[in-house]
C-alpha cells in the first residue's frame, strides 16, 4: 500500500490574516500545492484540502488548512486523520515558531506544544503529540511588543524579501520528510540560528 501523508498548515482563516507570521504554515501549503497545480477544495472536516502528488512518482499528500482560528485547529486535524484512516505518525504540522529566529527551520517528531496554542489544540484533539512538526522561525517581537501582536502582523520589508526562500525551504523539508525521513530532512534543513 502506498504511503499517504496529511500535511496541515496552521493559521487563521480569512484574507486579513493571510500574510501574517501566524499563517506562515498555510503559505508553505500554498507553495506545495502550486508545485503540482493542486487546488484546495472545501472538505466536510471544516478544512480546505488539496490531494495529490507534489513530485511525480513521489508520496501522496493531503494538504489541509483548518477553517478554524489557530486555537481551534485540533478538531479538523483529528477529523482528517480519521477520515483518511491515518495514524498521527503520518501527520506533518507546519507552524510558525516565535522561539526560532526568522529565516530558520527546525524539524522534529513528538514533544509538547512549546506554548503554541494551535499545536496545543492539535495534541489535545488528536490525543497524541507523536507527529512531525516543521517549525518555521518568525522570531520574537522587538522591544516590548506582545507576542500575540507580533504573530498577527505582517512580515517586515526585510523579511518579505527572504520569505519566498524560507517558504520554499519549508516546502522542500516537507517533501524530504515524506520521501526520505525526518533525519535526512534535519540534516539538510537545520540551519544556523
Curated annotation (Swiss-Prot):
<keyword id="KW-0378">Hydrolase</keyword>
<keyword id="KW-0820">tRNA-binding</keyword>
<dbReference type="Pfam" id="PF01195">
    <property type="entry name" value="Pept_tRNA_hydro"/>
</dbReference>
<comment type="function">
    <text>Catalyzes the release of premature peptidyl moieties from peptidyl-tRNA molecules trapped in stalled 50S ribosomal subunits, and thus maintains levels of free tRNAs and 50S ribosomes.</text>
</comment>
<keyword id="KW-0963">Cytoplasm</keyword>
<dbReference type="InterPro" id="IPR001328">
    <property type="entry name" value="Pept_tRNA_hydro"/>
</dbReference>
<dbReference type="GO" id="GO:0072344">
    <property type="term" value="P:rescue of stalled ribosome"/>
</dbReference>
<feature type="binding site">
    <location>
        <position position="17"/>
    </location>
    <ligand>
        <name>tRNA</name>
    </ligand>
</feature>
<dbReference type="InterPro" id="IPR018171">
    <property type="entry name" value="Pept_tRNA_hydro_CS"/>
</dbReference>
<comment type="subunit">
    <text>Monomer.</text>
</comment>
<feature type="site" description="Stabilizes the basic form of H active site to accept a proton">
    <location>
        <position position="96"/>
    </location>
</feature>
<feature type="binding site">
    <location>
        <position position="69"/>
    </location>
    <ligand>
        <name>tRNA</name>
    </ligand>
</feature>
<comment type="similarity">
    <text>Belongs to the PTH family.</text>
</comment>
<feature type="active site" description="Proton acceptor">
    <location>
        <position position="22"/>
    </location>
</feature>
<feature type="site" description="Discriminates between blocked and unblocked aminoacyl-tRNA">
    <location>
        <position position="12"/>
    </location>
</feature>
<dbReference type="GO" id="GO:0006515">
    <property type="term" value="P:protein quality control for misfolded or incompletely synthesized proteins"/>
</dbReference>
<dbReference type="InterPro" id="IPR036416">
    <property type="entry name" value="Pept_tRNA_hydro_sf"/>
</dbReference>
<feature type="binding site">
    <location>
        <position position="71"/>
    </location>
    <ligand>
        <name>tRNA</name>
    </ligand>
</feature>
<keyword id="KW-0694">RNA-binding</keyword>
<dbReference type="GO" id="GO:0004045">
    <property type="term" value="F:peptidyl-tRNA hydrolase activity"/>
</dbReference>
<dbReference type="GO" id="GO:0005737">
    <property type="term" value="C:cytoplasm"/>
</dbReference>
<dbReference type="GO" id="GO:0000049">
    <property type="term" value="F:tRNA binding"/>
</dbReference>
<comment type="function">
    <text>Hydrolyzes ribosome-free peptidyl-tRNAs (with 1 or more amino acids incorporated), which drop off the ribosome during protein synthesis, or as a result of ribosome stalling.</text>
</comment>
<feature type="binding site">
    <location>
        <position position="117"/>
    </location>
    <ligand>
        <name>tRNA</name>
    </ligand>
</feature>
<protein>
    <recommendedName>
        <fullName>Peptidyl-tRNA hydrolase</fullName>
        <ecNumber>3.1.1.29</ecNumber>
    </recommendedName>
</protein>
Amino acid at each position: 500500500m502506498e504511503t499517504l501523508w496529511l500535511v496541515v498548515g496552521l493559521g487563521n482563516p480569512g484574507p486579513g490574516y493571510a500574510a501574517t507570521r501566524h499563517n506562515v504554515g498555510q503559505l508553505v501549503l500554498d507553495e506545495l500545492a502550486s508545485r503540482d497545480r493542486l487546488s484546495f477544495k472545501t472538505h466536510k472536516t471544516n478544512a480546505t484540502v488539496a490531494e495529490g502528488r507534489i513530485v511525480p512518482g513521489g508520496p501522496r499528500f493531503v494538504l489541509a488548512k483548518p477553517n478554524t482560528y489557530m486555537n481551534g485547529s485540533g478538531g479538523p486535524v483529528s477529523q482528517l486523520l480519521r477520515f483518511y484512516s491515518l495514524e498521527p505518525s503520518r501527520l506533518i504540522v507546519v507552524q510558525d515558531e516565535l522561539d526560532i529566529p526568522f529565516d530558520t527551520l527546525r524539524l522534529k517528531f513528538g514533544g509538547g506544544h512549546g506554548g503554541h496554542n494551535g499545536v496545543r489544540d492539535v495534541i489535545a484533539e488528536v490525543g497524541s503529540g507523536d507527529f512531525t512538526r516543521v517549525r518555521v522561525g518568525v522570531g520574537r517581537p522587538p522591544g516590548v511588543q506582545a507576542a500575540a501582536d507580533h504573530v498577527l502582523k505582517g512580515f517586515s520589508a526585510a523579511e518579505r524579501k527572504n520569505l519566498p526562500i524560507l517558504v520554499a525551504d519549508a516546502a522542500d523539508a516537507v517533501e524530504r520528510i515524506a520521501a526520505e525521513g525526518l533525519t535526512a530532512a534535519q540534516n539538510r534543513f537545520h540551519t544556523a540560528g
